[in-house]
């Protein structure tokens, strides 16, 4: 795959807006990658890796806020760690997860990402998802397509559910929706070729956009889990909704996606269950 030039604007392919998002994601990504190396030492010594991860998360969010606010001073900012910060421009908001896949990061598993979405009047118009561990950079802008390191993305074309590999989320034991997730998996396990549970919603969505996964569903997510990923899937030719099939994941917190066929089949199966 091609490489997005580090921190340098790409005149041919990407807008000024995307370049702002990429530059911010890469800078925060370098910080997280350094912290990942430290985590591996802390795992051996058992000296409070969880506290360290919390600090790494907050540090990455502040870096993102600083860079994005400098480039677009009036925009609002909705972040997992710092909550909502109102901007003077009420029509635009960044929706940011500075470290999606915290548990993976805590255990030194290189499946985590920075997720940046930009909403205009409540509709996501651009997204960047960056995994600094493997330098995979996903970008999408409304009407302009989705890309992974400069390569155009398309969702997978399979039209038989029993040939599909799908991902799902599994809430922690004790959460009210844990039992429902297990029930959904039990119903679907005989209908698909396989399940994957990677532990980072933004990357699950990006993997659907890239055709690596045929579908993905999860309930009770937050806007920062979904914002960048949903435009990624749509710009790659996929369909995204809530469990009802025609609802907005940003409003409901539930997401189902895949190509048009897979999305429809998943909705048909999941909707009656919960």
Feature map (PLM): residue ranges:
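DPxDG-like acidic metal-binding loop motif
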Residues: 88-147
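N-terminal subdomain of lithium-sensitive/metallo-dependent phosphomonoesterases centered on the IMPase/IPPase/PAP
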Residues: 7-99, 261, 268-271
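Short secondary-structure boundary/capping segments
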Residues: 44-45, 69, 84-87, 129, ...
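Small-residue (primarily alanine) positions within well-ordered alpha-helices
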Residues: 21, 25-28, 127, 146, ...
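Residue-level signal for inorganic ion chemistry
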Residues: 32, 57, 68, 102, ...
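An extended, acidic
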Residues: 154-274
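Generic detector of well-ordered alpha-helical packing
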Residues: 58, 62, 81, 98-101, ...
């Amino acid at each position: 795959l091609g490489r997005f030039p580090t921190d340098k604007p790409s005149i041919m392919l990407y807008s000024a807006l995307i370049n702002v998002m990429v530059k911010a994601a890469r800078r925060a990504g370098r910080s997280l990658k350094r912290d990942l190396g430290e985590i591996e030492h802390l795992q051996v010594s058992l000296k409070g890796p969880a506290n360290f991860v919390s600090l790494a998360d907050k540090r990455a969010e502040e870096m993102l806020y600083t860079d994005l606010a400098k480039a677009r001073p009036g925009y609002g900012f909705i972040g997992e760690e710092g909550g909502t910060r109102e901007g003077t421009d009420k029509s635009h908001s960044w929706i940011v997860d500075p470290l999606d896949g915290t548990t993976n990061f805590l255990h030194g598993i290189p499946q985590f990402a920075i997720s940046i979405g930009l909403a205009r009047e409540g509709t996501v118009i651009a997204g960047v998802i960056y995994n600094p561990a493997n330098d995979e950079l996903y970008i999408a802008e409304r009407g302009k397509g989705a890309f992974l390191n400069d390569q155009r993305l398309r969702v997978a074309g399979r039209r038989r559910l029993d040939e599909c590999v799908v991902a799902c989320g599994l809430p922690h034991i004790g959460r009210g929706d844990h039992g429902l997730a297990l029930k959904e998996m039990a119903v679907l396990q005989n209908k698909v070729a396989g399940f994957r549970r990677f532990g980072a919603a933004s990357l699950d969505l990006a993997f659907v956009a890239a055709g690596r996964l045929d579908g993905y569903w999860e309930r009770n997510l937050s806007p920062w889990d979904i914002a960048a990923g949903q435009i990624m899937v749509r710009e790659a030719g996929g369909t995204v909704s809530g469990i009802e099939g025609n609802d907005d994941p940003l409003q409901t917190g539930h997401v189902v996606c895949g190509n048009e066929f897979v999305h429809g089949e998943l909705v048909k199966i999941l909707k009656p269950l919960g």
